[in-house]
Amino acid sequence: MGGCFSVSLPCDQVVSQFSQLLCVRGSYIHNLSKNLASLQKAMRMLKARQYDVIRRLETEEFTGRQQRLSQVQVWLTSVLIIQNQFNDLLRSNEVELQRLCLCGFCSKDLKLSYRYGKRVIMMLKEVESLSSQGFFDVVSEATPFADVDEIPFQPTIVGQEIMLEKAWNRLMEDGSGILGLYGMGGVGKTTLLTKINNKFSKIDDRFDVVIWVVVSRSSTVRKIQRDIAEKVGLGGMEWSEKNDNQIAVDIHNVLRRRKFVLLLDDIWEKVNLKAVGVPYPSKDNGCKVAFTTRSRDVCGRMGVDDPMEVSCLQPEESWDLFQMKVGKNTLGSHPDIPGLARKVARKCRGLPLALNVIGEAMACKRTVHEWCHAIDVLTSSAIDFSGMEDEILHVLKYSYDNLNGELMKSCFLYCSLFPEDYLIDKEGLVDYWISEGFINEKEGRERNINQGYEIIGTLVRACLLLEEERNKSNVKMHDVVREMALWISSDLGKQKEKCIVRAGVGLREVPKVKDWNTVRKISLMNNEIEEIFDSHECAALTTLFLQKNDVVKISAEFFRCMPHLVVLDLSENQSLNELPEEISELASLRYFNLSYTCIHQLPVGLWTLKKLIHLNLEHMSSLGSILGISNLWNLRTLGLRDSRLLLDMSLVKELQLLEHLEVITLDISSSLVAEPLLCSQRLVECIKEVDFKYLKEESVRVLTLPTMGNLRKLGIKRCGMREIKIERTTSSSSRNKSPTTPCFSNLSRVFIAKCHGLKDLTWLLFAPNLTFLEVGFSKEVEDIISEEKAEEHSATIVPFRKLETLHLFELRGLKRIYAKALHFPCLKVIHVEKCEKLRKLPLDSKSGIAGEELVIYYGEREWIERVEWEDQATQLRFLPSSRWRWRET
């Protein structure tokens, strides 16, 4: 019995220990919710401790006599790392909690839930450990100084401090020798560089000298050399006898022995450091150079390919700065003033220069009437606001003056015709410029577009235009820069009626003008004007924007006295249903836009406008005919897409007579027209956008598309064809040959809907620059790219290299997008809805843009649960970024 007892005791212990182990591991799963809550609570405590330490450091480092201890910095870095890990962990907590079952005591995937639960426990322990280490008796120590001249500056706000920290970290990186700071005038570049200068006085003796030089537009090499020499102890009478090269040698001999920082403020062109005598900063010598400029091009010429943009302030940051300038007493003098002050601050659009000047001007205004008047002036004629011309517009004008040539300046000023904060389509803007004669249309469409985009790029890099972040095809103008452009257009305010811009201000009638003969440009777009009756002598008028109004009728007299009108835009006047015959008197007209109007018949006089090169008749739902268009023999761009207009053989013949035509957009809804039009190589080369609609199977069983090198956008809707084939040329000898080179080299957007006979879209292999693909409501589509057909065409073509967005809607038969995983180096969004048979996406863990999220939207929650991922790594890569979203139809 004794022997048995001695054996049973160790067995009990083993069982007990094994049970405890199972309980511990089981707790990773069934205590997951509780453990996550504990982790979140511990993280809040750690953040609070981090905040206390940072606040102590800011107080002690403020004097510039203290620097933080290394152990404190190590602890802060560890906290940042654990915070990032915590955020990553938290992103997938909903998925993990949904995976639990049996009231949280089990999981649909024990392995994944166990791993996640264990990570939660391990992180909880690490957070608690870091929190306990965050008690410091001392956080900083005394530090020596570099040779720095501190420069006074006005108090700054949180947003500017964040920008400072970012710039400082970039400059102080070991591999960084030179930092470029660029941004529009008045955005705070000099303030930022000043704070960088002063910060060097608070760090240790890593640098021997910090040199500040104001360069400006008129600076010379000699002037820069003199400023540097004064700082390093050179100069004297003998310098007047030396040339620039000899002085450069002297400066170089001094600086090569010292670890220096050179800060160059306000440079307008490349500063040749070698010519000045400054050793080029490198990792080896440990020296630093930072500069500010208004032009990103200058950054490139200085050898900085990744400069830091100094941006306008966010709305709340703008309000903080504006409050600081106006003062608490003024803001508190009447309960309505803070609300009005916010409206005034918004007019500045985050530009610190404007916030400072306007804030100071309003600091003594303590009545509601004064604030309301300020809003009225800033809205209707900002140039009349106190300080606007002298302190803001003159400062910004330096950027305009620095533009190279009158062409660039004219193109810039043209952008001020659009309303405040208006998104301007780049290609549409270039079409205006071509029609105005800024760009010579005889150079050909491709050259014109390239030149136009080069001008836009230059203006963006000069911070005079802003490129839209989401949609790179749009630009806009900062409101204060727009005021500067309007001021310049009016000869610096001397001829305010030379360029009349009242866009988007709620006008109901054409404004009164003292002398119409002096008016060159008028923009009344985005208003509520209904009738245009007046007739005026507009001998100098070249541009008239009336788009996006409520115009119902235009009198016959209106067009009689505009002999030099070149651009007329009447688009998006949806109540406009007729035009007077007197349109024929606009003999100089080159650009005419009637899109989105309800005009049912074009006046015969329109066909007499022989100078017309751009005619837009898109989305005209009532237009019946354009017979006679061949009389516009100089026409180069013609928009017909989405109009009620029927494209028949007689119209095709007229289009073939337009010898100068370069761009056309149209709809094809008849097989009788499709074949002859697609056999006309000259017309095919002009097609930029085309929609095939209502082509029935009995008439077009196979749609054969020729090479369309200029095609940008393609729609195929409600068609019955069974297959789409591609031919490389339009000649009959090659009609059935498979293409070996891209046939749609510029095609970027494809829409296919309600084509119930199609089985696949393998022809998309020959659209290498496709960025957007939407396929919907086509019940027989089984493959986007058929593996079998793809091998027949070319085994070497990899599809969708440029694809950014993929939408798949109600494709009940869709089984595959592609047979194997693709790299998708540009893909950002996949949206799948009502595609029940699609079980696998062509993704692996390396698909998508490196370091960026690829969002998968799905319409049915059960679909995402059935997706078969390539492997676990792929699932972990994409499942957390999958989101339910029902498509609005």
Swiss-Prot record:
Q: How does it assemble?
A: In uninfected plants, interacts with PBS1 through the coiled coil domain. Homodimer.
What subcellular compartments does it reside in? Cell membrane
Residues noted as binding ATP in the record, renumbered to the chain: 183-190
Q: Does the keyword Nucleotide-binding apply?
A: yes
Record-linked Gene3D superfamilies: Helical domain of apoptotic protease-activating factors, P-loop containing nucleotide triphosphate hydrolases, Ribonuclease Inhibitor, Winged helix-like DNA-binding domain superfamily/Winged helix DNA-binding domain
Please give an example of a GO cellular component term from this record.
Answer: plasma membrane
Residues covalently joined to lipid (S-palmitoyl cysteine): 4
One annotated GO biological process: defense response to bacterium
Result of changing residue 799 to S: In rps5-1; impairs defense reaction against pathogens
| Disulphides | none
- What is this protein for, i.e. what is its function? Disease resistance (R) protein that specifically recognizes the avrPphB type III effector avirulence protein from Pseudomonas syringae. Also confers resistance against Hyaloperonospora parasitica (downy mildew). Resistance proteins guard the plant against pathogens that contain an appropriate avirulence protein via an indirect interaction with this avirulence protein. That triggers a defense system including the hypersensitive response, which restricts the pathogen growth. Requires PBS1 to trigger the defense reaction against avrPphB.
Domain of life from the UniProt record: Eukaryota
Sequence similarity: Belongs to the disease resistance NB-LRR family.
Q: How does it sit in the membrane?
A: Lipid-anchor
Domain NB-ARC span(s) in chain numbering: 140-444
The remark listed among the other comments is:
RPS5 is absent in cv. Landsberg erecta.
Q: Which gene produces this protein? A: RPS5
Check the record and name the InterPro entries matching this protein. Answer: Apaf_helical, LRR_dom_sf, LRR_R13L4/SHOC2-like, NB-ARC, P-loop_NTPase, Plant_NBS-LRR, WH-like_DNA-bd_sf
Which residues bear N-myristoyl glycine-type lipidation?
Answer: 2
State the name under which the record lists this protein.
Disease resistance protein RPS5
The organism is Arabidopsis thaliana (Mouse-ear cress)
Which Pfam families does UniProt cross-reference here?
Answer: LRR_14, NB-ARC, WH_DRP
Q: Which residues cross the membrane?
A: none
Output the SUPFAM superfamilies linked to this UniProt entry. L domain-like (SSF52058), P-loop containing nucleoside triphosphate hydrolases (SSF52540)
